[in-house]
Amino acid sequence: MHLMYFTEQPMSAYDAKEGLKYGATALTFSNKHFDPVAGSRLYGEYLEQYIYAEQVGIDGIMLNEHHNAPFCMQAKANIFASVLAGTTQRVKIVLLGNPLPLAENPIRLAEELAMIDMISKGRLVSGFVRGGGQEQRATGVNPAYNRERFEEAHDLIVKAWTVPGPFRWEGTHYQHRVVNPWALPLQKPYPRVWIPGVISKETIIWAAKQRYPYIALNTSIPQTKQIWKLYDDTAAAAGYQSGPENRGYLARIHVAETEEKAIQNAKQFMWMQGEFTGLAHPVWANPSGYFSPSGRRSFVEFAVGRAKNPRGNPTFEEQRADGMIMCGTPKQVLPRIRHLLEETRPGILAVWGNDGNVSHSDSMTCIRLLGQEVFPQLREWAKELGLDSPFEAEAPVNIAYAKDLKRPVAAAG
């Protein structure tokens, strides 16, 4: 099992009352509320936490990016990945990920990722995402072409990594007269690609066709089983049997020396969900064309008050009761994690350990307890349950490189 640490890197040093007063904290919430002095301090603390995670034995650091909102300070995941490539020695640098539809030049992105892979001596995992709905608006990208741009940018990046240049690319959304990057990944044929997501069936099917691991982002156990069913069926149709090496899960788990402290800090997971801030208007987050028509309709009905939030709005107590948030001492959370592993069988587990206004000191304590008391037990259970990571299973990077297919595949599509 591959065990990694994650935090959204929240810009928590702003007046949350202003967000509540405005009614949203994404897209149009003014950046006059951003404090660069506090931002500089927070960036330093997050870097210290990542370096400490490596020191206590954590396998990987998961990074992401978001835009125009305080819940995530990473405007470019590749920047922190570059820093970690030069300041760490062992941990995998897992980008989940670069929002491909927002990229106007995928070749530049391919070059950046290749540099990170070389500087880190082959420790990059390059995940790709579609980007949030409001981020399409922020960058001026037509959300109706989101999936087309995602798939075409992916294909162009992979070709730039694997096919010697120069060659020409004349696509629907990207045109390059000369593709010939003089920066190529150290890992061959190219760095592993993992695909995170929540509810998009189209993305699950696409990932399975590519044979890329799919990382379920804190979905419920029943939802996660539905995801694996769709993935497994797609994999079987593509000619291979999927397993734990194709499955990842992001869980919100905060550990502390006492249960009282853990509960106090874990309540900060509600910070991003709008209990303390506000987040985006549903129509901004789900612009026309971004979701399938049925998904779009459910969010619009919610926005105008005709229906409940399709993603639900459970309280902290409800999420703790059903395992969506786990908190306590290591001994208290381990049985709940064991249940999660038995039910969802992931070969990749990302622990979202800290959020909101959790102090730097408490964040470091959580990381220490994860690395020294929680993860060692999880590794033993993973061996018992046969939960191999893609690295342990030596899974192919892409279906195009598979040697175990029940029927030949010309290329991943």
Give the ranges of each region predicted by the language model.
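Hydrophobic faces of well-ordered beta-strands that scaffold small-molecule active sites
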Residues: 3-7, 61-63, 93-96, 124-128, ...
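Glycine-rich, proline-tolerant flexible connector loops at the mouths of alpha/beta enzymes
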Residues: 60-80, 99-100, 219, 351-363
